[in-house]
Amino acid sequence: LKYEFENIFPGCRLLDIHEYLFEKGLTLPDKGQKYLYHEPCHTPMKQYSSIKVAETLLSAEVKMSDRCCGEAGTFSVSRPDIAAQVRYRKEHELKSNLLEFDETPAKILTSCPACQQGLSRYESATALETDYIVVEMVKQHLGDEWSKAFTHQVLNGGMENILL
């Protein structure tokens, strides 16, 4: 399957939200936090290095955590026998990654919903919470209750009141 966006939308680029924010120069203040980054097997970031994007947006040290998380859409359901072995290797990779830090990183971040679900399976073994880069940025900027406030605004004032 080949995407032909250039034929449908001439002159337009397809960018992941993280790359868009990176190009716009958006960054958080440096809080001395450290993160692991799990790059999805089918990463949405195509224009820039995902580590460079994450480090720049978060103003933080970000280290890559290799290996598939074992979720891969329907893979974990269709082939649980193989997925279990992939998850076993990923768990060992995460534990190895943690040894590279002086202190436990704040979280493991990703840019894929299936990977976020897969990575959440390791929280009890690693004490690492999983999130999207952009959600981590919003939480740091607006606080942990941002989602409730956003939902309240949408339900009571419409999207245009939030955007404008």
What annotation goes with each model-predicted range?
Residues L1-L164:
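Iron-sulfur cluster-binding electron-transfer modules in prokaryotic oxidoreductases
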